[in-house]
């Protein structure tokens, strides 16, 4: 069963993502509410997949990607972003994030992105 770390400052998003991912056969091994926690959890757990919100307090998802990828170049990180953050998303992809979804998104859209990232 593939493992996932869910990173989002909104508890309702972590719960919603967790429910979807469990339904698709993932094991939720950890959650984080900011980029700093995400780095710590990634180092500890080294999950198969990370869903990472872009805009969070303490440390952004982009800054977390910039710290995780040099240490773990094969990390599979999917960014979750609001509309209008495309320049930052390009920066995240250039720094090693594998793909992104834009809020609001459908479960089908998220599943398609996850399936593509997990195939690589």
Question: Which residues fall in each region the model found?
Answer:
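Receiver (REC) domain active-site loop signature in two-component systems and cognate sites
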Residues: 56
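Two-component/phosphorelay signaling modules centered on CheY-like receiver
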Residues: 11-30
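C-terminal output helix
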Residues: 87, 105-114
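Short, conserved "switch-loop" micro-motifs in signal-transduction and mechanochemical regulators
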Residues: 83-84
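Acidic catalytic/metal-coordinating carboxylates
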Residues: 34-37, 60-63
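Active-site beta3 strand of CheY-like receiver
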Residues: 45-51
């Amino acid at each position: 069963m593939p493992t996932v770390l869910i990173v989002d400052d909104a508890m309702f998003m972590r719960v919603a993502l967790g429910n979807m991912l469990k339904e698709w056969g993932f094991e939720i091994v950890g959650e984080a509410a900011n980029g700093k926690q995400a780095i710590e959890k990634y180092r500890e757990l080294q999950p198969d997949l990370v869903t990472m919100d872009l805009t969070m307090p303490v440390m952004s998802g982009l800054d977390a990607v910039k710290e995780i990828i040099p240490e773990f170049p094969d990390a599979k990180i999917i960014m979750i972003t609001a509309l209008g953050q495309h320049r930052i998303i390009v920066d995240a992809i250039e720094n090693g994030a594998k793909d992104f979804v834009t809020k609001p998104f459908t479960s089908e859209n998220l599943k398609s992105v996850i399936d593509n990232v997990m195939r690589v």
